[in-house]
Design a protein with these regions (language model features):
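A structural signal for short, hydrophobic beta-strand segments that form beta-sheets
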Residues: 62, 236, 292-293
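C-terminal accessory subdomain/extension
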Residues: 241-367
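C-terminal helical cap(s) of enzyme catalytic domains, especially alpha/beta-barrels
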Residues: 49-55, 220-229, 337
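A charged N-terminal "starter" segment
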Residues: 1-80, 86, 94, 102, ...
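Active-site loop/helix belt of alpha/beta enzymes
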Residues: 18-35, 90-104, 111-235, 242-243, ...
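Residue-level signal for inorganic ion chemistry
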Residues: 51, 146, 236, 314
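Flexible, glycine/charged-enriched surface loops at secondary-structure junctions
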Residues: 9, 183-188, 326-331
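Hydrophobic "anchor" residues on beta-strands that sit immediately upstream
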Residues: 13, 104-106, 145, 291
């Protein structure tokens, strides 16, 4: 569906950093490779090497910092590196030239995110363009791409839309200036994150770079008829019935007001269940939502089954998924959906399905 949305001429980069937002980078990358994606993006060389070690051969871009001592590994394993400033460009050039190799780079432009990239806004424009031109001519470096990152492309108010367009216009001005000054033609110009991929087709350029959208979350995914990839489930391990006036869990945050049947589920903050959600959310059972009660513990949490007769030990409980959207839980936690998906810890087993069939299981303990 994303391919249909962006059209046949625009390349597709799948962002799989942070273990593919908690979904499993290797498994997601393999699937994207099979489906014909053009590029992957990660945050670090460790993430890139994990993909290479597991048979992922397609181009990989590191968006974050890589120490200069690792340039040889980047070249050896055909990994592309983001260059964010003059100092990094010079470091990478010296290392690559000394090794007699060529490192592919994508140059990052800071157009308003105020994080990484050549600063090109206002009085910094000429200096930024000059620095990018210099990087393009350094020995040992091949400038394959240039990119920027939008700060509010996912916001639809007029002020945010205007800011995104200013960022895009500045990015295009920088590209034109570099092309005119040095005659450089970047094969890959990209700036469209999830929001821009969904809402600004004129900003797709040579390649789009969706993150959260790739996993089917948020209003943009709904607009494109995409479904969430992850369903997080557990089971009820035990039940107890308490009399009125019984306090539950640490800090006595919740006290029963009536005769209450409580279930314990083996999912706590060490697994990714935010402690700030204590007594503020519900988990979904086959008979309906079960309010979470009391303080969420490290390894377990409690749910109220009083109004759900028939729900018992061994029954499945959906923490988030199709019947209990992660967006709702994220709002209750005062955060964003991908903070919740990224937080699902490694001790939570992953089961991968395709067309309803289990294709792989990933467990913390391997026997």
């Amino acid at each position: 569906r994303l391919r249909q949305h962006i059209g046949p001429k625009v390349r597709f980069l799948g962002v799989v950093k942070a273990d593919a937002y908690g979904h499993g980078a290797v498994q997601v990358a393999r699937t994207l490779q099979e489906l014909g994606a053009d590029y992957l993006a990660v945050s670090s060389i460790d993430e890139a090497m994990e993909l290479r070690a597991n048979g992922v051969t397609m181009p990989v871009l590191i968006l974050g910092h890589t120490p200069k001592e690792q340039v040889g590994r980047l070249i050896e394993h055909h990994i592309t590196q983001a260059v964010t400033c003059k100092a990094k460009a010079l470091e990478y050039s010296r290392e690559a030239a000394a090794l007699g190799g060529t490192l592919k780079i994508h140059i990052k432009v800071d157009t308003g995110m105020s994080r990484l990239g050549y600063l090109c806004d206002g009085s910094h424009f000429d200096g930024g363009v000059e620095g990018i031109c210099e990087a393009c001519g350094l020995p040992g470096l091949e400038a394959e791409g240039i990119f920027t990152h939008f700060a509010v492309a996912d916001e639809q108010d007029q002020e945010s839309q205007a800011y995104t367009r200013r960022q895009f216009d500045l990015f295009c001005r920088v590209i034109r200036a570099v092309e005119e000054k040095r005659g450089v033609r970047f094969p890959l110009r990209h700036c469209a994150n999830t929001g821009a991929t969904a809402c600004y087709p004129e900003m797709h350029l040579d390649m789009v770079r969706p993150g959260l959208l790739l996993y089917g979350y948020g209003e943009f995914a709904q607009g494109l008829d995409l479904r969430p990839v992850m369903t997080l489930k557990t089971t009820i391990s035990t039940t107890k019935t308490y009399e009125p006036g019984t306090s539950v869990s640490y800090g006595r945050l919740f006290t029963t007001q009536r005769r209450t049947r409580m279930g314990v589920v083996p999912y706590g903050y060490a697994d990714g269940f935010f402690r700030c959600l204590s007594d503020r959310c519900s988990l979904m059972t086959a008979k309906g939502p079960a309010p979470q009660r009391g303080r969420i513990c490290m390894d377990m949490s409690m749910i109220d089954l009083t109004d759900l007769p028939g729900v018992d030990v061994g029954d499945e409980v959906e923490i988030f998924g199709p019947h209990n959207p992660v967006e709702v839980m994220a709002a209750q936690a005062g955060t964003i959906p991908y903070e919740l998906t990224c937080a699902v810890s490694k001790r939570v087993p992953r089961v991968y399905l395709q067309n309803g069939q289990v294709t792989e299981r990933e467990l913390l303990l391997r026997f």
